Amino acid sequence: VLLAHLPDVLDRLRLAGAREIGIAATVPPGMPFPPRADDEDVVLLACRRATFEWALRASVVGRDAITLREGVTVAGLEGEQRGGGRPTVTGVRLADGTVIPAALVVDTTGRRSHAPQWLAALGAPAPRERAVETGIFYYTRFYRQRRARAPQGTTGLVASDLGWIKLAMFPGDGDTFSITVGAPVDEPRLKGLSDPHRFERFLAAFPSVAPWRARGASVPIAGADTPVLVMGQLKNRL
């Protein structure tokens, strides 16, 4: 999609050190993977979300057809009845009362979206949704690898599901990567993973990620004070 529609964003990401990983390189050793002619079209872009959003913003700012409004808050939707059916959304209302008319409103605020309440205020039904609790917390810490000491011959992409615990390692831009532990919410002993020292001791027990932290292969991205980021209330939504 980026290559076809936003090549300037892809160029910025490449300059920032984003890595492109072909689908064949992600297959675990020993797993049969018959190649297909279109495999080269499936590419993972390894970069941090902040880097991606920076590149996307830079592209938006440079386009005359797009107006970027910063420091404003959307407080609700504007709408009207047409033909006696459901209300039609006609724009958004800002916190200061300003109304911005629109032919199409796209809400990308994620799981904390106020769209259901805003639609209800217009007399419209909320979007249909199915949500299932995942039953896990995410504990994530970011690192910067030292090329001379990092494990060689691997993409740095790790995904391990051990049943009682899940581990994932994601390569990023500029020699960065993150390690995430998915821990069950009903296991109080694992809540200590929010402490960086306990988090590191925990990682050392797993061969899939331990080499990336052993013998100075990497350092926490902001030094010893790099926090372990915790994400809860995780749901799968459809």
Tell me the role of every PLM-derived stretch:
Residues 1-28:
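N-terminal FAD cofactor-binding segment of flavoenzymes
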Residues 16, 71, 214-215:
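Conserved beta-strand termini and adjacent loop/short-helix elements that scaffold enzyme active sites
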Residues 76-79, 143, 169:
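A structural signal for short hydrophobic beta-strand segments in well-ordered beta-sheet cores
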Residues 81, 147, 172-175:
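Short acidic-glycine loop/turn motifs at beta-strand connectors
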Residues 119, 157-188:
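Active-site substrate-recognition segment that forms the wall
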Residues 19-105, 109-118:
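Conserved N-terminal helical subregion
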